[in-house]
A protein has these predicted regions:
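Conserved, structured core segments of small domains
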Residues: 1-139
Length: 139
């Protein structure tokens, strides 16, 4: 079963910055472990306002009890509240339609673009523009 979990963290004002960083490092390490076990499927960071620390997570667990154990194992549980939404299959889910996607990868689209160079444009301008775009493409 899959669960969407909104995790909202409120760090105590009295907590030293170095202690917060240590907890965040432990959280990152535990997240990697859960991902390797196939229990943590995805994490997203929604747009945040100043002072917010919120994460959306997609978890796989056999039941609510196992999910609670997984969440309890992730620091900083004492600073965090979790809002859990159990997810069920949707009749239009691509997987149910036989369309499988690699985790983290959506459908791919082939897009053809035609660039028209205005008549009379010097060849050097075209070459420079193509070179600039080639440098930017990996970004």
């Amino acid at each position: 079963m899959e669960f969407l979990v909104t995790m909202t963290t409120r760090v105590p004002d009295s907590m030293p910055a170095d202690a917060v960083e240590r907890v965040r490092a432990r959280e990152a390490a535990r997240s990697r472990e859960l991902a390797a076990q196939g229990k943590l499927l995805r994490l997203w960071r929604p747009p945040l306002r100043p002072g917010e620390w919120r994460t959306l997570g997609l978890f796989a667990a056999d039941d609510n009890g196992e999910l609670e154990q997984l969440l309890a194992s992730m620091p900083p549980r004492s600073w965090r509240t979790d809002d859990v939404t159990p997810l069920g299959a949707h009749p239009n889910d691509p997987v149910g339609q036989g369309i499988t996607i690699a985790p983290g990868k959506g459908p791919e689209f082939l897009i053809a673009t035609t660039i028209m160079v205005p008549p009379g444009t010097p060849a050097q301008v075209v070459d420079d523009t193509v070179a600039r775009e080639a440098r930017r493409a990996p970004q």
